[in-house]
A protein has these predicted regions:
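Conserved N-terminal subdomain of the carbohydrate kinase-like
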Residues: 1-69, 225-235
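Residues that scaffold the ATP/ADP-binding catalytic core of kinase and kinase-like folds
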Residues: 39, 125-126, 164, 217, ...
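Solvent-exposed alpha-helix faces
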Residues: 59, 141, 211-215
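Residue-level signal for inorganic ion chemistry
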Residues: 68-71, 118
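Extended, hydrophobic alpha-helical segments in both membrane/secreted and soluble proteins
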Residues: 69, 86, 97-99, 105-108, ...
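Conserved phosphate/ATP/ADP-binding segment of small-molecule kinases
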Residues: 75-169
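Conserved post-catalytic alpha-helical subdomain immediately downstream of the catalytic base
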Residues: 146-151, 175-234
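ATP-dependent carboxylate/acyl-activation modules
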Residues: 169-170, 227
């Protein structure tokens, strides 16, 4: 992975290795170039020593940062302490924090700028129905009010997105032609959303661009990124 990152001129100086942790093994079941399901084998053995290293690294880099994306895979890396320290430091510097959550405890993301749960992740914290636009509006408001998060973008798969900001709701429709592999769609959404929002786009326009990026990513086989040049063709 580090070799691939270096080949693409991605900085690798701050990667932290843990020789005691087990790398997740993900087995994908494919038919006709479409992913049916995935089987994961893993252990959450992340150490407190690495938590301290991450916090120290975060503080050393925050002055060079335009925005922060927290992609929580619920593997032990995104500890409560790391999240609390990161969000607090970012807010002190007026840096926006975007969170792709996991699990049923969204309190650990308190005071983040934006959270982007999918429908399944929303169900983990919201007990109301999720059938139509109004239901998703209520869920967005509940998440922001309950967990003190400024904005919310719920990704709804083929039904698009619901965006909540300053007591205003917007719905973005999705139109994927063919869905071959949803792997990486959430990462594509939050990376695109954060990039365009930080460049000065409104949250709703940033979400529209992120939705468009995700549409094209799921139409490719495998975990495939979309380049800015590709995305510009569709804007």
């Amino acid at each position: 992975m580090e070799k691939i990152m270096k080949k693409d001129d991605i900085q690798t100086d701050y990667i932290i290795y843990d020789n005691l942790a087990m790398t997740s093994k993900k087995t994908r079941f494919i038919t006709n170039s479409q992913q049916l399901l995935r089987w994961d084998v893993e252990k959450n053995t992340y150490s407190k020593i690495n938590e301290k290293k991450l916090i120290k690294t975060m503080h050393s880099l925050i002055d060079e940062t335009d925005f922060i994306v927290i992609s929580d895979y619920n593997k032990g890396v995104c500890s409560d302490l790391l999240l609390k320290d990161t969000i607090k430091a970012a807010n002190h510097k007026e840096i926006k924090v975007f969170v792709d959550p996991k699990g049923s405890d969204f309190y650990k993301y308190k005071n983040a700028y934006c959270i982007t749960p999918n429908t399944l992740e929303t169900r983990a914290v919201y007990n109301g129905p999720l059938k139509d636009d109004k239901d998703f509006e209520k869920a967005c408001k509940f998440i922001c009010d309950t967990f003190s998060i400024k904005t919310c973008v719920i990704t709804r798969g083929k039904d698009g997105m619901t965006v909540y900001e300053s007591n205003t709701f917007s719905h973005i429709r999705s139109n994927p032609k063919d869905v071959f592999d949803v792997s990486g769609a959430g990462d594509t959404v939050i990376a695109t959303l954060a990039t365009y929002k930080t460049r000065g786009e409104s949250l709703i326009n940033s979400a529209k661009i992120a939705n468009l990026a995700a549409e094209h990513v799921v139409g490719k086989f495998g975990t495939t990124p979309i380049t800015e040049q590709e995305l510009n063709k569709y804007l």
